[in-house]
Design a protein with these regions (language model features):
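Post-signal peptide N-terminal regions of Sec-secreted extracellular proteins
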Residues: 21-147
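Fungal secretory targeting signals
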Residues: 1-25
Length: 147
């Protein structure tokens, strides 16, 4: 009987501590988008969550894999489906390199990724519902953070 009581107590504690694993209704739209987005971006979070004035939250990751991989996505903080755009552009290369994602999204746009970025800088452009935000061109050079 004691073992059964302890097991029930442990299960109730685990559910309360981790509602995502047991009850999808307990997860906010932004948290759900963040969980899904993180599954797409490997590596370490090097910037973010950065709240953008245009209604989104940007996250940027860096991994040493693939000669240095940068990955980014932006969550939709507006609570409705809107046109979203995100691009990641290598600004250190003479060859134009860009990855982008766009469409009508209710949760997030991205993930966008560029490999071979270990000694390169990049720029991020985000568009949400007709408004835009752009980083500096010399942002996150070589996987490090530039404020």
């Amino acid at each position: 009987m004691l073992a059964k009581t302890l097991l029930a107590l442990f299960a109730a504690t685990a559910v309360a501590a981790n509602p995502v694993a047991h009850d999808d209704r307990a997860v906010s739209i932004e948290d759900r988008a963040d969980i899904e987005g993180r599954a797409l971006c490997a590596g370490n979070l090097i910037d973010g969550p950065r709240k953008l004035s245009i209604g989104g939250t940007l996250r940027v990751y860096y991994s040493s894999a693939g000669g240095g991989t940068n990955c980014a996505y932006v969550t939709n903080d507006l609570g409705k489906e809107v046109f979203m755009y995100i691009s990641l552009q290598d600004t250190s290369s003479s060859a134009f390199r860009l990855d982008d994602d766009y469409g009508d999204f209710s949760q997030f746009a991205g993930a966008v990724k560029l490999d071979g970025m270990a000694k390169h800088c990049f720029q991020v452009l985000v568009g949400i519902d007709g408004k835009t935000w752009m980083s500096r061109k010399d942002w996150h050079c070589g996987g490090g953070k530039v404020a």
